[in-house]
Design a protein with these regions (language model features):
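Long amphipathic N-terminal alpha/beta scaffold segment
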Residues: 88-108
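Hydrophobic alpha-helical core bundles mediating ligand binding, dimerization, or RNAP-core interactions
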Residues: 25-29, 46, 50, 88-93, ...
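Active-site neighborhood of HAD-like aspartate-dependent phosphohydrolases
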Residues: 1-45
């Protein structure tokens, strides 16, 4: 048995949907830019533009919007019309109004964990501060959490700072998230625990599904999370890992 004191939940595509909305915006974006390039070419160059902008813009809806505009100018060789740029801006703004509607089973599971009084529960997410705070507020999940921590990127050092902030050792931290590279791998690297709930809408390499680690639990649904937390203590039931 392993004692867990702090549970850090990812937000987008773990507590509520996000990637599907970005995919919808990108589809409309490709239609707007159809006079200049194929949808595949637009998406390919957009990925490259986003990646190049991460060091300066970081992650989130606003960073995505700026990359959409920059890529539109680039792929059209400066010929994109002002009206089309306006359309891109308007459709992108919809990402700033996402409802943050919790996935099935999320609210009930969080309520069950919260009501035990045995864990400190936080949202640990990356992205633009105001955007993430607004989604969190609209989600209706605030009563179940002690805090929300928003960082520019999720790295081993970011998880170490999180442990220091809340006064816990890495082995007392449990991270829950959909992205192996962002939510899972960094916390495993510092000796923490992780519950991976894969999101098949993401763009990650699927090879992570074959990874095995003694501190890694992989689930198919959020509601299964409580199966691995002992009902009468702050422990992970390791007997259920096999």
């Amino acid at each position: 048995m392993t004692e867990i004191s702090l549970i850090a939940f990812d937000a987008d595509d773990t507590l509520w949907g996000s990637q599907t909305y970005f995919n919808t915006v990108e589809k409309v974006y490709c239609e707007i830019l159809a006079p200049y390039a194929s949808a595949d070419e637009v998406s390919h160059t957009l990925r490259a533009t986003e990646k190049a902008n991460i060091p300066l813009l970081g992650y989130g809806s606003k960073a995505f919007m700026l990359s959409l505009i920059e890529n539109a100018v680039k792929i059209s060789h400066g010929k994109v019309k002002g009206y089309d740029i306006g359309q891109i801006v308007e459709v992108s703004k919809e990402l700033l109004r996402l409802p943050g509607h919790p996935f099935d089973g999320v609210k009930a599971t969080l309520a069950k964990l919260h009501d035990t009084g045995r864990y400190r529960m936080i949202v640990f997410t990356k992205g633009e501060l105001l955007d993430q705070e607004n989604k969190f507020q609209r989600s209706g999940l605030r009563p179940y959490f002690d805090d929300i921590v928003i960082v520019s990127d999720k790295t081993p050092d970011a998880y170490k700072r999180l442990c220091k902030q809340f006064g816990v050792k890495a082995k007392q931290l449990l991270a829950v998230g959909d992205s192996y590279s962002e939510d899972i791998a960094p916390v495993l690297k510092i000796g923490g625990w992780a519950i991976h709930i894969p999101d098949y809408m993401d763009n990650e390499d699927r090879s992570y599904l074959n990874k095995i680690h003694p501190h890694l639990i992989r689930l198919s649904r959020f509601a299964e999370l409580t199966n691995f937390l002992s009902p009468n203590s702050r422990l992970i039931d390791e007997s259920k890992l096999s």
